[in-house]
Amino acid sequence: MEDIRRFLHTLYGLFEKGTRIRGILGCFLGGLFLNILIELMDRKSFSAVLVLLESHPLAFLENVLILTFSLSLCLFSKRRWFFGILIGTVWLGLGIANLYVLSYRVSPLSAIDFAILQLDWSFIGIYMSVPAFILLVIAVILLLAGLVMLFKKCPKSPVHRLFNTAVSVILLCACIVIPYLPTSLGFGENTYTDVIRLTENYGFAYTFTRSLVDTGIDRPEDYSARRVRAIAAEVLRTKDKAPEDVPNIIFLQLESFFDVNRLKDVTFSENPVPYFEELKETCPSGYFTAPSVGAGTANTEFEVITQMNVHDFGTGEYPYKTILQETPCESIAYDLKKLGLASHVIHNNTATFYDRNIVFPKLGFDSFTTLEYMNHVETNEIGWAKDKILTKEIVRALSETEERDLIYTISVQPHGAYPEESETADIKVLSGIEDPALRGQMEYYATQIHEVDEFLRTLTDVLTTWEEPTVLVLYGDHMPSLEISKDMLDLSAGGLFETEYVIWSNCGVGGADRNVKAYQLSSRVLELLDINVGTLTKFHQLNPWRGAYETELRTLQYDMLYGDRVVYHGEQPFEETDMRFGTRDITVNTAYVRNDMLMVRGKNFTPYSVIYVDGNAKETTFLSEYAVTCAADGIEKGDRVTVRQVAEDGTELSEAIADPYGD
């Protein structure tokens, strides 16, 4: 009895002073205000915020409590006002950043965006004008100055550590427990990991926080060696199968490409994609369900290359930025090596975006040709490389090897952000879009995909006469980041997650049309070629795409990447490849000084070639693919002269070595 009395006395003491209650009450009110403000920026109307409150009240409360918990951390400092304002400013900044992100794409801001952010002007300049960037820098400077002044001037308050700890722990526990309450209480089913649906149904603060901590594939409840063997039994029994004459296989992933003729009641001055529509009529084709809308190219790549479902991973996760940083993963590149195919990736953008330069060796590719290894590249109005350069690069990859090739090609031309006014938009919207801004963006986009359509015709013309049997698989990686709603689409022709794919060949490959998800495309292509090699190729081909199929696929994925690798008999059978950049060597033949300039001559230089003298980069002028030059200041006999290919972000990709200067 005495113990109970002592406990009650302690509780009374905790709540005795009003300052303690005022502190946590202030955090709660601050969290409520921040949540309303952030959701208002995300949903762009107060009525939409009320819809969230009415339809998912527990989700609304969850967001408020997450914000309250983060604000409550300020109570552990004597300068609670400063740290409270600092934490609130961070959340407000995230809300503003989300508002800006949603102005040029469909998917909301998530934690992974900070991992893939490129802080170089070649990237930032596409999404932000110079005046806007200057204003942003000024705003950040003023904000930092204001925070410094606040830190110096703000009053100090007593810290009640026991009370604050108790409250923070209660808030944290509530944040963890609420999402797992019964759906009837108002939170709803939240097992999916797509940030668009999560943010729409459960709010920005919850989704963003979840994207911070939710990575990888959760261990299935029934995971065991016996369970994996049961799932993979037929896969393990099935022998590899392939025809004697395996063709070249080219995957062509078209950036933000879809047939705009699917838009209801929208007419154009001419058909933007006549050749693509012709291909759909004459080749095996179907709808292609991408893992995201308006963004997420790397996840579409991941699904096609590995045949894994990215939605089984964490919220908004890009496996390129997590598990594939360290762990090799079975892929079509590894699998087709068994059949003697060399494997290449071609991308007319920088090598380092999404850490592709790090990831592709872990997916088994032999070479990676990027913008840094291309010459005579034309760019569109907003700076993206035009896709027609890819024809030459694909032919070069086919020519450089004696064996047959797997070529995974990633285009970039129709990438956003789309300008509302364009000087180069030749195709006009005649009717169906009233908003002038969207109409201008659509005209620019239609013009870009029209050029891509012409590139497709040129590429297939070249491949038609290619001496080796060749299969070309082309598809849009996701819908463009335009304000296209479901109401604007003929839903009988696919929804917002559906683009289309076509399988073309110069060797008579045929087959019935079939709709696929991104992670099913490769097995579909290989099935038409009578190829059955690799764990997931066999799994997809041997199983009907229904019933327990998705659950069993998830278990296999967990086992292959995070589990005991039962399907591989407990081993890691895949080694990172010694991937080269480009398919041709960059060579240095001579280096000499003339008129106070160091001239370096060789082969296959590009505008991304940089001269290094004893390891120090020099400001380099690109003259031609045979010569680059820099100032000869300070260069002495015996200095080591090299030429390296350097990405926009400063990453050194590869190197050619010259003889010491003067020898």
Residue ranges and their predicted role:
Residues 3-16, 20, 24, 132-145, ...:
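N-terminal leader/auxiliary helical segments
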Residues 120, 249-254:
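Residue-level preference for non-acidic, small/hydrophobic
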Residues 178-251:
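Membrane-interface segments at or immediately adjacent to transmembrane helices
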Residues 111, 196-204, 294-295, 385:
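Membrane-interface micro-motifs in multi-pass membrane enzymes
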Residues 2-198, 637-640:
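Transmembrane and membrane-interface helices of multi-pass
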Residues 114-117, 201-206, 225, 273, ...:
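Alpha-helix initiation and N-capping motif
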Residues 236-244, 254, 259-663:
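Solvent-exposed soluble domains appended to multi-pass membrane proteins
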